[in-house]
Design a protein with these regions (language model features):
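Aromatic-lined glycan-binding groove of carbohydrate-active enzymes
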Residues: 71-118
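Mid-to-C-terminal alpha-helical segments outside catalytic/metal-binding sites
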Residues: 71, 79, 89, 124-125, ...
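Active-site neighborhood of phospho(di)ester-bond hydrolases with catalytic His/Asp-centered motifs
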Residues: 3, 32-34, 82-84, 126, ...
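Aromatic-anchored helix/helix-loop segment that forms the rim or "lid"
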Residues: 62, 105-136
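Active-site gating/metal-coordination segments in enzymes
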Residues: 1-70
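Short, well-ordered coil/turn segments that N-cap beta-strands
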Residues: 1, 27-29, 77-80, 116-123, ...
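Active-site beta-loop-alpha junctions enriched in small/polar residues
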Residues: 4-8, 36-38, 86-89, 128-130, ...
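Distinct, well-ordered alpha-helical segments
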Residues: 13-17, 42-45, 94-98, 134-139
Length: 201
């Protein structure tokens, strides 16, 4: 059953989506957001695998901006969204989005009176960013406590060695690595970590 569009590029406070968000928050559901409508660019992404390389990160950034400026996280602060691919291109445009919200509130602050960058700490993402510099930027955006291991399995844009970027990120302590590789996901899902070691799980 499809409850949401493939990406949340139009996630505004409509009656239907408010009801849906309320139910998801009540049930402690985690909403994993993965892009797919990345072919609708008037043919400009036809070559060089660009729907996947450029279109997907852009779609994810649009979804995040819709959630932030659509007032969803203000109305439902316990609602957990986890965005694929390290939040797409959102971390690099985060400052631009916040600046736009400040200088054009007539366009950007119609639904939400809280600056987007004040809500970043409520976002979750996976770790699939492919290099250390991108991971560092992501950490500065959502916090290392809100990043879970991403694999993109079985698709070719996943890491060839799952978790390698996390494992090799030098600023991390061993506890940080443990958190990103599995413990953060346990906390995000709200489950007892001990059940993972239960053979009947």
């Amino acid at each position: 059953m499809r409850l949401l569009p493939p990406t949340l590029t139009a996630f505004y406070a409509t009656e239907k989506l408010l009801e849906h968000s309320h139910v998801c928050e009540e049930l402690s559901v985690v909403l994993f957001v993965h892009p797919w409508d990345m072919h609708m660019w008037d043919g400009r992404l036809q070559k060089f695998w660009m729907p996947w390389l450029v279109g997907m990160p852009s779609e994810t950034a649009q979804a995040i901006c819709s959630v932030l400026m659509g007032n969803i996280l203000v109305l439902f602060p316990k609602l957990r969204f986890c965005f694929a691919h390290g939040g797409g291109s959102y971390p690099i445009i985060r400052g631009r989005v916040s600046h736009g919200w400040n200088v054009r509130p007539d366009l950007c602050a119609q639904e939400c009176q809280v600056a987007p960058n004040k809500l970043d700490g409520l976002l979750w993402t996976d770790s699939l960013v492919h290099d250390a510099a991108a991971l560092e930027l992501l950490i500065s955006t959502v916090g290392k406590e809100h990043i879970v291991l991403g694999t993109d399995y079985p698709f070719p844009l996943g890491e060839l060695e799952v978790g390698k970027v996390v494992e090799e990120y030098k600023p991390f302590s061993s506890k940080d690595r443990e958190n990103l590789l599995w413990d953060n996901a346990v906390k995000m899902l709200g489950i007892d970590g001990n059940t993972l070691f239960d053979k009947n799980f």
